[in-house]
Amino acid sequence: MQLLSSCYLFNGLSESQLLRLSAITKEEQMRKGHFLMHEGQVAEALFVLKEGFIELLTAVNDDFELPIAILRNPGDCSGTSSLVAPYEYSLSARCAEDGTLFVIQQADLKHLMLKDHELGCTIMKNLAQHLLERLKETRQELKIHFKTLFKSSHN
């Protein structure tokens, strides 16, 4: 339960809410090289890292995937596309080493969120804040790339 509380999605949940969340959470072993999800696939689960590394990838073309990030801290999560329409994973996730993760099925989490609106609002608020931070980071990266491109084209 403590690991779930370290996941940004579940910040601010009460102990009783975390207990209900842990009741729908399953611990699974992950093997190096195994894909947890594929970009464009129907998003059916949320994954919370317990131990190991998960590499997040996006397809550039048919034979090349670009690494976007590595989840390495206990409590890091992926699969938040399972909470937002159109419910398709926006990235692929591959286990970079053997480890353990918690899996929460989308249907179970949505049911819990509908039963406990406060829990649902907290999770969605945390998701919105996280996505806003990611948007800001992406905007900063674009500025850097644009400046570099602009400088190189004017030299």
Residue positions per predicted region:
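Cyclic nucleotide-binding regulatory module and flanking cytosolic helices
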Residues: 1-27, 31, 82, 153
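Cyclic nucleotide-binding regulatory domains
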Residues: 34-97
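A short, charged helix-loop
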Residues: 101-102, 111
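A small-molecule sensor/coupling module
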Residues: 89-90, 108-149
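Helical coiled-coil/dimerization "stalks"
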Residues: 149-155
